[in-house]
Amino acid sequence: GAITARMQGEEKLDFDLLTRTLQFRPGDRYDQSRLIATKRRLDATGVFSFTAIDAQIPDSSDVRLSHVLNLQTRVRHQIRFETFMQQRSGALADTENELGAGLGVTYSNVNLFGGGESFRIRSTGSLAADIGGFGGFTSAQWESSASLSYPYLTFPFGRLDRFSRLYDARSQVSLSLLAARRDALKLTLRGRGGARYRFELRH
């Protein structure tokens, strides 16, 4: 047997993404549990909004049972804006009564390179002021984070992904940066950064 694919209205989808999620190969004995595992793996990639595996009725003389995978991809690009307010008082605030407001934006791409890679970047900024003593702005904060997630295990665990029946597998690289100014605490600038490489798998 062979694996073929036909795409309509989708210009950026790597065929390797489909073959990587298959839990069976042409010529294998029929096993419904492997079909179910394949559908779960396709759903777990986050690329598709609809997945279905349908069996084709074979000829009476044909011992093979062909299957068709019907997939519908999600909208690739998403942008979200957010606003928020916060109020602090007592030991956690720079003044007796501090009120702050902020703005944030998030961009997401569920299929960055065509292989199911999920990219997300988020940035927020906020300002706080003394509303009790009318002392003006008391603090400012800026935070940004970015992550890139693969729907499979990368080096050095890629072989484990290929030779085991995992319900879901994911590798993620993430970065975060934070900078803040606190006038009342005599801190003119505070910065913090972090990086993380994480593997997730479910059997």
Regions found by a protein language model. Give the residues of each.
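Gram-negative/organellar outer-membrane beta-barrel architecture
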Residues: 11-12, 31-203
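N-terminal export/assembly leaders
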Residues: 14-19
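Second-shell loop/turn segments in exported
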Residues: 3-8, 20-29, 134
